[in-house]
């Protein structure tokens, strides 16, 4: 595990302990009962693939450890609507506060503002967090293989499935991919960012994609800024992308989302 992931795990474990002391599992289950049913995160992406379209998981992210503040005028409901209007299939919403200035209420508000399924983007270590995710309205959780053992990943996956949520399993190298493929989740994310150095290269996705059988749905993550980047990854068999920073920095988020998905030339030809 990288140094940054170790630091994150330390504060996450403290956060979880504090949350458990404040909100019981029974409380979370009561909150879940008040949420609308999961919207089918994987199914929304699979439908795009089957139709021959790019699938976009559009990220609502205020800040990051590597870039600092990304969007000062941060309005999760407005961003959710803008992404939906631009053609995004799903949302990803940061709920981690120390590193990303995220919050649970951002997830709840963004999902309520549109009809798209939403991922709780956070660092998951305990099943309590899975119940938090569903209580806050999430349709999917993220599992980062670099920070979990195989047993932990399976336990979190199975808990998520039991609540009707999907699971995006994230990897960065070949050993992590081999471990991810032992899980039953069909959603595999390849993070092009090295969490030790923060360097980003699309070659990571291109290299690892060949390891994955056709019954899985691959998601390219990080370093995707243009339609040309999407086309490049498509050549490697990746038709689904998680994009945050490059869209969050644009004034017209809807137009930027559409341009990423179909290209400026296609828009100009309309």
Swiss-Prot record:
It is an enzyme of class 4 (lyase). The keyword Amino-acid biosynthesis applies. Coiled coil: none annotated. The keyword Hydrolase does not apply. InterPro entries: Aldolase_TIM, Indole-3-glycerol_P_synth, Indole-3-glycerol_P_synth_dom, Indole-3-GlycerolPSynthase_CS, RibuloseP-bd_barrel. It comes from the Bacteria. This is Indole-3-glycerol phosphate synthase. It comes from Rhizobium etli (strain CIAT 652).
């Amino acid at each position: 595990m990288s140094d940054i992931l170790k630091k994150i795990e330390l504060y996450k474990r403290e956060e979880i302990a504090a949350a458990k002391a404040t909100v019981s599992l029974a409380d979370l289950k009561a909150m879940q009962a008040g949420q609308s049913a999961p919207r089918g995160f994987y199914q929304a992406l699979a439908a795009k693939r089957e139709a021959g379209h790019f699938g976009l998981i559009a990220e609502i992210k205020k800040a990051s450890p590597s870039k600092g503040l990304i969007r000062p005028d941060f309005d999760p409901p407005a961003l959710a609507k803008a992404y939906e209007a631009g053609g995004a299939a799903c949302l990803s919403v940061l709920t981690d506060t120390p590193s990303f200035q995220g919050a649970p209420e951002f997830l709840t508000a963004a999902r309520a503002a549109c009809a798209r399924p939403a991922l709780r983007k956070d660092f998951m270590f305990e099943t309590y967090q899975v119940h938090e995710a569903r209580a806050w309205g999430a349709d999917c959780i993220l599992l980062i293989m670099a920070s979990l053992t195989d047993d932990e990943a399976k336990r979190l996956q199975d808990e998520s499935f039991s609540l009707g949520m999907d699971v995006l399993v994230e990897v960065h190298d070949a050993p992590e991919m081999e471990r991810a493929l032992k899980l039953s989740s069909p959603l595999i994310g390849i993070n092009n960012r090295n969490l030790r150095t923060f360097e980003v290269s699309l070659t990571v996705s291109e290299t690892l994609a060949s390891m994955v059988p056709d019954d899985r749905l691959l998601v390219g993550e990080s370093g995707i800024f243009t339609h040309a980047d999407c086309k490049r990854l498509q050549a490697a068999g990746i038709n689904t992308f998680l994009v945050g920073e490059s869209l969050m920095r644009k004034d017209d988020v809807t137009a930027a989302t559409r341009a990423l998905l179909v290209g400026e030339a296609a828009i100009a030809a309309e």
